[in-house]
Amino acid sequence: MTCIGIIGLGQMGSALAKAIRKSDDTVPLLLNRRHLNQSQALAQEVQGELVPVNRLLQEADIILMAIKPNQVRSFFKDHYKTIQSLQGKLWLSVAAGVSLTELQELTPSDHQWIRLMPNTSIEIGKGLVAYTGGDSTSQSILDKYLKASGSLVPISEDKFPAFTALAGCGPAYIYILIEAMSDAGVHAGLSRQEALAFACQVVEGAGAMVKETRQHPALLKDGVTSPGGATIQGVRKLEEAGLRSAIIEAILASSQGK
């Protein structure tokens, strides 16, 4: 039976562990983090086993690296001898900015690498996961064990910075929008609970409209704005404040790491 190991149990590593368990309720999960005693609750939730890193490296067929990008090289340096003795592993990396070429240099030639870029919505099965690398067999394995995370999208590696900025950083921008909308609702007389619930539903519904009708967002916007009405007055204020440009600049800045 295939065994999966996860190294790094921060927010992303934990979310991926949960997604894997939801995708397959029998696959053995080996978990590792620097301080093993800090993830007992997660291990129990996903029916995984907290183990030392050397055991994980030796026993796992698929190894998911969920550590920070600046820790990748030092990890492989620290465990060089063990890793060089391993055969035929499939590695998954969520380290932003660390290329497939760089990753492949860290392991024996018979190992395969797939780069992943998930967003945090995988925690509830509504995420978006871009991936590149591997062959058709390894990609089918990825589909099998991450199907509960949301949508998996193959993209070329050169598109990773743009994807990261839009889909990886994007949820933070939407949270700001939801917060601002709910603040406005409270100012207008709604309770905080009402305002937040309404704002969330508006964002969810608008996204679904674009996706399901396949109409351009501008056409859908025009369908809401009537001549001289309240909506077009609000749109004028958004344009006056430069919202459209601010969103574009935020995503471009994220894609360039600035």
Cite the ranges covered by each PLM segment:
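A short acidic, helix-capping loop that chelates divalent metal ions and anchors anionic groups
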Residues: 123-127, 162-164, 233
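Internal alpha-helical scaffold of NAD(P)-dependent oxidoreductase catalytic cores
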Residues: 45, 102-112, 128-163, 174-212, ...
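Rossmann-like NAD(P)(H) cofactor-binding subdomain of soluble oxidoreductases
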Residues: 16, 36-39, 46, 50, ...
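Aromatic-residue-lined binding/catalytic grooves and analogous aromatic/hydrophobic interfacial grooves
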Residues: 170
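Small-residue helix-packing motif on alpha-helices
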Residues: 39, 72, 191-199, 220
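NAD(P)-dependent Rossmann-like dehydrogenase/reductase catalytic/cofactor-binding core
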Residues: 200, 204-258
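NAD(P)+-binding Rossmann beta1-loop-alpha1 motif at the extreme N-terminus of oxidoreductases
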Residues: 1-58, 126-127, 186-187
